[in-house]
């Protein structure tokens, strides 16, 4: 049986929401192994002089927990 944990992460990009999601996964991947999915819960943008300047997401990243083999 697999156990899945979920992290809630906020990320941003000056390019687009897809890049913000990729950054969230890359950053989480530095300390979390076995990432299985990302769910974009919410997204927003910062507007400056009538232009979108920052793309923000709130995401949930799920990962499989490795069983502890220590006995």
Task: List each language-model region with its residue ranges.
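C-terminal structural segments of small proteins and small subunits
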Residues: 50-71
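Extreme N-terminus of proteins, especially the signal/transit-peptide cleavage junction
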Residues: 1-3, 69-70
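Short, conserved loop-to-beta-strand elements that form functional interface hotspots
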Residues: 38-47
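Short beta-strands and strand-coil junctions in structured, solvent-facing domains, enriched
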Residues: 16-17, 47, 68
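Short, well-ordered alpha-helical segments
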Residues: 2-36
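A structural signal for short, well-ordered beta-strand segments
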Residues: 9-11, 43, 57-63
């Amino acid at each position: 049986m697999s156990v899945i944990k979920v992290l809630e992460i906020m990320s941003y990009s000056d390019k687009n929401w897809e890049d913000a999601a990729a950054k969230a996964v890359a950053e989480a991947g530095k300390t979390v192994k076995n990432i299985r999915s990302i769910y974009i819960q919410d997204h927003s943008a910062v507007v400056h002089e009538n232009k979108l300047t920052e793309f923000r997401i709130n995401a949930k990243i799920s990962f499989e927990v490795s069983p502890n083999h220590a006995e």
